[in-house]
Amino acid sequence: MVITTGLVLSFIVVFILAWLFIKTIGNNKWLSLLVSIIATPLLYFWMFYPMLNIFTSYHHQKYFNAEDWQEFPELRYEMVDQIKQQNQLIGKTKQEVEAELGEPEWFGWDETIKANSNDLWNYNLGFKPGAFNNQQECLELQFKNDTVAALKTYQLEKKFE
């Protein structure tokens, strides 16, 4: 898990709320502090974070790991931010990308040749958490001379029946 500003701020908010609530039970400030420290992670991961996921598309970020990318495709959206920010794939060959990400799931449409192109690789990133999210996240790699020249993310709307 990548420690972000949002994660730290939300932990602080949960800690303050837990401390204020526990302080109403008794006046012993050291006991209230100790119980608040113990209760904060429990309250965060069992109450605050699930409620946050229901109403927003906030999610934790993870460091990119090639094994996790291939083993847990539904969690790829957590790793793609690091790939984009650090340009980890720019300049890599098709063989190197295939070794890290696996075979492309589909080829993108190229308007210039009016067909699917072997130079536009697409990967499904899964759905970000949220009760009202029907957007599937996707990653497209654009190759020039068999090396990655650009990458972009986009969303596909899925209809659930």
Specify the residue positions occupied by each region the protein language model found:
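Residues within mature, well-folded domains
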Residues: 2-161
